[in-house]
Amino acid sequence: MKKFLVFICFALAFSSKAIGKETTYSKELFDKALSEGKVVVVSSWIKYCSSCAGQMEVLKKAKKDFENMEYFAFDVTNKEIAQFFNVQYQTTLLIFKDNKEVYRSIGETTKELIYDALKSSI
């Protein structure tokens, strides 16, 4: 029961950061999306980060233009997830296709460059 309550608190804390179709990262959902052949976009953020907010705004718009992709976000202070993706900085953007990482950027907030990366992943 204690583990369940900890899990619920953890889920609620991180789910508040999801925007639009973006989902707080979970390994199970990430693996499922990849196994279904979807292009997966993963972004990292941290509270009070202006470049993170800028990138999230671009991704929020991109979700409408690239609806066939799956979007996940995680707080970069979550060391387990950060290590899994080898992410050391907030505003890191990753794109996966065919079970492989095909794009990585750090600090990119320019709509044109993010859209180019998304288009090249289709």
Predicted feature descriptions by range:
Residues 4-13:
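Sec-dependent N-terminal signal peptides
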Residues 10, 18-37, 120:
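N-terminal leader/targeting and pre-domain segments
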Residues 29-30, 79-81:
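Short acidic active-site motifs
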Residues 35-47:
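Short active-site neighborhood of thiol/selenol oxidoreductases, capturing the structured segment around
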Residues 44, 67-80:
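Thiol-based oxidoreductase modules, predominantly thioredoxin-like and allied folds used
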Residues 52-65:
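Typically the conserved alpha-helix immediately C-terminal to a functionally engaged Cys/Sec
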Residues 85-94:
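Structural micro-motif
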Residues 97-122:
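Non-catalytic, surface beta->alpha helical segment in thiol-disulfide oxidoreductase systems
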